[in-house]
Amino acid sequence: MTERRIIHIDMDYFFAQVEMRDNPKLKGKPVIVGGKASSRGVVSTASYEARKYGVHSAMPMSQAHKLCPNGYFVTSNFGAYRETSAQIMSIFRSYTDKVEPMSLDEAYLDITELVRPDLPASKIAQYIRKDILEQTHLTASAGVSYNKFLAKLASGMNKPDGMTVIDYRNVHDILMTLDIGDFPGVGKASKKVMHDNGIFNGRDLYEKTEFELIRLFGKRGRGLYNKARGIDHSEVKSTRVRKSVGTERTFATDVNDDEEILRKVWELSGKTAERLNKLQKSAKTVTVKIKTYQFETLSKQMSLRDSVSSEEDIYNIAYLLYNDLKDPDVPIRLIGVTVGNLEQSTYKNMTIYDFI
């Protein structure tokens, strides 16, 4: 049986990072997302600069203001967060259909079928983080391991903008020295019960019998017993059927030079064709999307009689669609190429890996 390879991606201070990306004046400042300082709400996310003052998620805004009176208090913009999250989830699904989103800013990916001797899980995680950075200008942290519990644990160990791999060589040492409050799923109430029963770290938890833990925590006790041993058999649950494959890029500065834009269209067509090839799919629709410098989103789609899967075919159609969309007087900040109406390909484009 092939050993599983699971990645857990967790965006860094997601809401605050989106706000700083969309308003560069906030970069490097103590940003607190949730509402006005005088509001009765709670903190959704705080930047790392704000966390230095003791501000954290779920804290009352009034308390956050007392701790960080010079902070930049921002009202949540869920439209922007959802749009960015959709971009990120699309990146995940360009690698695998086995994606389990846990929230707007985190997900598990089962990439077992993608791993090869020359393409370890850690390298795939690096590619995913690179794609997120290039397409959204946001950083993400990743955890890589052989089950979901350890992957999630790993993703929080080297934040922000970091990656940690937990495998059979280091799992025991990591778990034994881990503070009990750092175990995923152990909240304040559970932590207090653990402390009251002499459990302060992973080793203390490991030394408890399964019976003792069930007595203390009921059914959860069996899960805690397994976690202390790095055991988790839960699957990455994905009910989504892939309907499209696509890639988009945000330019560093607004662009209205056709040559530069079409170079990017060629690049995106190639990446899209590569992903279709991995899935052994072809497509009967091609869509080009642009976002103008004024953040207006425009798109145009073409339905095809015969399906396409090659870089050249996708580019030729995308070229026509872009020419229909473009306005020489309006610079753009983003362009995307997506193919849809997927069907099983009768011909698999060959890559170098097919000959190895």
Curated annotation (Swiss-Prot):
GO terms for molecular function: damaged DNA binding; DNA-directed DNA polymerase activity; magnesium ion binding. GO terms for biological process: DNA-templated DNA replication; error-prone translesion synthesis; SOS response. InterPro entries: DNA/RNA_pol_sf, DNA_pol_Y-fam_lit_finger_sf, DNA_pol_Y-fam_little_finger, DNA_polymerase-Y, DNApol_IV, Rev_trsase/Diguanyl_cyclase, UmuC. Gene3D superfamilies: 3.30.70.270, 3.40.1170.60, 5' to 3' exonuclease, C-terminal subdomain, DNA polymerase, Y-family, little finger domain. Binds 2 magnesium ions per subunit. It comes from the Bacteria. Residues 6-187 form the UmuC domain. Its EC number is 2.7.7.7. CDD domains: PolY_Pol_IV_kappa (cd03586). The active site is at 106. It is found in: Cytoplasm. Its cofactor is Mg(2+). Mg(2+) binds at residues 10, 105. Keywords: Cytoplasm, DNA damage, DNA repair, DNA replication, DNA-binding, DNA-directed DNA polymerase, Magnesium, Metal-binding, Mutator protein, Nucleotidyltransferase, Transferase. The record marks 15 as: Substrate discrimination. HAMAP family: DNApol_IV. Monomer. Belongs to the DNA polymerase type-Y family. Poorly processive, error-prone DNA polymerase involved in untargeted mutagenesis. Copies undamaged DNA at stalled replication forks, which arise in vivo from mismatched or misaligned primer ends. These misaligned primers can be extended by PolIV. Exhibits no 3'-5' exonuclease (proofreading) activity. May be involved in translesional synthesis, in conjunction with the beta clamp from PolIII. This is DNA polymerase IV. It comes from Staphylococcus aureus (strain MRSA252).
